[in-house]
């Protein structure tokens, strides 16, 4: 597995292969909820304009692109790791596990997997075949399939935080999405934590030890 930093290298790599799955994650930093990943194989005959790192897009634009990706992609799959798995494995290894689940869930086996960042786990397709993978630093802004994966993962997790907000409105999940903000710290100090919290994360662990 190699790590690429430049768009030129990534483009040459991409153009030399067949079907490519882009993989990205969201939710490594929050104190609550799953870490969510997505794997997307785009259809080269159905281009999608405006793909970019999900963090650089407005919520409205992400939602529109989410629907377009779901409609036009050859296939996509969401993988996740639970708070319990995060606590057991640590957030890095749980994220790698979630990425593996996303790729294994694709109903088409890609020839190559491109992962955002500087790390990539070992991937196996749904048919048991091993897959070649490379990591692309800032790939979510460079490679269309990774951008698409970042959008699928981001919208999926944000929607889950909205559901959690409806169940626990006193925590403000719809606003901070579970990230460690001042308002979130104040909420857990007042109301405590529940089973969706990552108990190995320092702020949560400190509260439980009081």
From Swiss-Prot:
Pfam families in the record: RNase_HII (PF01351)
Needed cofactors: Mn(2+); Mg(2+)
Gene3D superfamilies linked to this entry: Ribonuclease H-like superfamily/Ribonuclease H
Broad class of enzyme this protein falls into: hydrolase
EC number: 3.1.26.4
PANTHER family hit by this protein: RIBONUCLEASE H2 SUBUNIT A, RIBONUCLEASE HII
HAMAP family: RNase_HII_B (MF_00052_B)
Protein name: Ribonuclease HII
Species lineage: Bacteria, Pseudomonadati, Pseudomonadota, Gammaproteobacteria, Alteromonadales
């Amino acid at each position: 597995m190699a790590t690429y930093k430049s768009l030129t290298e990534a483009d040459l790599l991409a153009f030399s292969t067949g079907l490519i799955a882009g993989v990205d994650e969201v939710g490594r930093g929050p104190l609550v909820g799953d870490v969510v990943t997505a794997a997307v194989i785009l259809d080269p005959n159905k281009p999608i304009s405006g793909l970019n790192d999900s963090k650089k897009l407005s919520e409205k634009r992400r939602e529109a692109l989410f629907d377009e990706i779901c409609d036009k992609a050859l296939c996509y799959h969401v993988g996740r790791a639970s708070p319990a798995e995060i606590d057991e494995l640590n957030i890095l290894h749980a994220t790698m596990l979630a990425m593996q689940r996303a790729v294994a869930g694709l109903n088409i086996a890609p020839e190559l997997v491109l992962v955002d960042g500087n790390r990539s786990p070992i991937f196996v397709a749904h048919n048991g075949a091993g897959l070649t993978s490379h990591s692309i630093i800032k790939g979510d802004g460079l490679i269309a399939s990774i951008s698409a994966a970042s959008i699928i993962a981001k919208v999926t997790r944000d929607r889950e935080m909205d559901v959690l907000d409806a169940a626990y409105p006193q925590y403000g999940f719809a606003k901070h999405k579970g990230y460690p903000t001042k308002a979130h710290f104040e909420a857990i100090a007042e109301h405590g934590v529940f089973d969706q919290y990552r108990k190995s994360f320092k702020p949560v662990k400190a509260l439980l030890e009081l």
